[in-house]
Amino acid sequence: MSTIIFGVVMFTLIILALVLVILFAKSKLVPTGDITISINGDPEKAIVTQPGGKLLTALAGAGVFVSSACGGGGSCGQCRVKIKSGGGDILPTELDHISKGEAREGERLACQVAVKADMDLELPEEIFGVKKWECTVISNDNKATFIKELKLAIPDGESVPFRAGGYIQIEAPAHHVKYADFDVPEKYRGDWDKFNLFRYESKVDEPIIRAYSMANYPEEFGIIMLNVRIATPPPNNPNVPPGQMSSYIWSLKAGDKCTISGPFGEFFAKDTDAEMVFIGGGAGMAPMRSHIFDQLKRLKSKRKMSYWYGARSKREMFYVEDFDGLAAENDNFVWHCALSDPQPEDNWTGYTGFIHNVLYENYLKDHEAPEDCEYYMCGPPMMNAAVINMLKNLGVEEENILLDDFGG
């Protein structure tokens, strides 16, 4: 009996000793106490926080909202900050978005940096103008088969001081959305029924954040307008979950509340006299509309400009009256739509084919100096790649090719 008791006592003492060792090691290895994050050398911008979390979270907790379209997952590469000291070594997860040269300059992804010690950061001053608003849905209407126009009302007395080409981030709570509950007008239901899309559901167990470019321009006051394409599973792989944020947005009804933050952006027009060529497709319409309206309505620009939009069929064209009106009012602006798959009932007599080919064959091929134009584009990835390849073959420098990756 005494042997058994001795064994139990020794085992207990060993466990207690190991616990003490772990606690001692933790006290030495894991930082405790307050952490100070200095920003831009300005004492008034300094943040005091607790160690252990991510830098992106610490900044957001202090009301400093750094853009992160993926919600902190490390996949979008937007939450770049410059860390002068205290950030530790760069992680492999960051190197997909940050070059070795940028890393030497202190570039990091805030969502991947753990807060372990006092830090010294450099942030763009415009970040401090980013705010968060709870908006109200005005409308959420189909503009094409798979694209809705979400129109949000900003709270009374507030404004979002964005520039044309900018974007906001939408926050979605945990939710369970059934596609069968979507409001899809009869004229668009054919493809939905054909591909049996109403069978899908989207269940999200934690809040998510995604970025969308504005379709309105700064002088359309009091609203935020977005073009949102539903991200359904690909036909050849129907078991892939549908897009979480697009499913949530498509479920919104007039009167619902929706939280956004912003403004963010870098897809801004250059302040030059160069000719502007806009190329869009799908939900890439949004920043194109914002830019063109801003140039012609707010700035009263006299720069030569054209807009080339690609759609599948006439049913997928939208804002036609808007652009027709702008073309009628402004001698320096023309716009063209090309259909890649016009239907018999369309009675289409305009351009057909993919928009990069149409743009080249009907304009740039005979342009006296295509390399001198500025090209602004937003659309599906394949369209973007085709347009960029075509422009580079024409000798257009990268500095004159401006791309918004959020569309399509």
Swiss-Prot record:
| One of the record's GO molecular function terms | electron transfer activity
Tree of life domain: Bacteria
* Domain 2Fe-2S ferredoxin-type stretches: 33-127
Q: Name the coenzymes or cofactors required.
A: [2Fe-2S] cluster; FAD
Q: Where is the FAD-binding FR-type domain?
A: 130-270
Provide one Gene Ontology cellular component. plasma membrane
List the PROSITE patterns.
2FE2S_FER_2, FAD_FR
Residue positions binding [2Fe-2S] cluster: 70, 76, 79, 111
**Compartments where found:** Cell inner membrane
Which stretches are transmembrane?
A: 4-24
This enzyme catalyses: a ubiquinone + n Na(+)(in) + NADH + H(+) = a ubiquinol + n Na(+)(out) + NAD(+)
Q: Describe cofactor binding as the record notes it.
A: Binds 1 [2Fe-2S] cluster.
Key words of the record:
2Fe-2S, Cell inner membrane, Cell membrane, FAD, Flavoprotein, Ion transport, Iron, Iron-sulfur, Membrane, Metal-binding, NAD, Sodium, Sodium transport, Translocase, Transmembrane, Transmembrane helix, Transport, Ubiquinone
Entry's Gene Ontology BP terms = sodium ion transport
Membrane disposition: Single-pass membrane protein
Q: What happens upon changing residue 111 to A?
A: Loss of the 2Fe-2S center, but does not affect flavin content. Exhibits very low NADH:quinone oxidoreductase activity
Task: Using the UniProt record, name the top-level EC class of this enzyme in a single word.
Answer: translocase
Its primary localisation, in coarse terms, equals membrane
Phenotypic consequence of residue 212 to L? Decreases flavin content, but does not affect the 2Fe-2S center. Exhibits very low NADH:quinone oxidoreductase activity
What's the EC number here?
A: 7.2.1.1
Give the protein's biological function.
Answer: NQR complex catalyzes the reduction of ubiquinone-1 to ubiquinol by two successive reactions, coupled with the transport of Na(+) ions from the cytoplasm to the periplasm. The first step is catalyzed by NqrF, which accepts electrons from NADH and reduces ubiquinone-1 to ubisemiquinone by a one-electron transfer pathway.
Q: Record's HAMAP family?
A: NqrF
Record note on quaternary structure? Composed of six subunits; NqrA, NqrB, NqrC, NqrD, NqrE and NqrF.
Q: Family membership, please give it.
A: Belongs to the NqrF family.
By its UniProt entry, which NCBIfam families does this protein fall under?
nqrF
Q: What is this protein identified as? A: Na(+)-translocating NADH-quinone reductase subunit F
Organism expressing this protein natively: Vibrio cholerae serotype O1 (strain ATCC 39541 / Classical Ogawa 395 / O395)
Taxon lineage: Bacteria, Pseudomonadati, Pseudomonadota, Gammaproteobacteria, Vibrionales
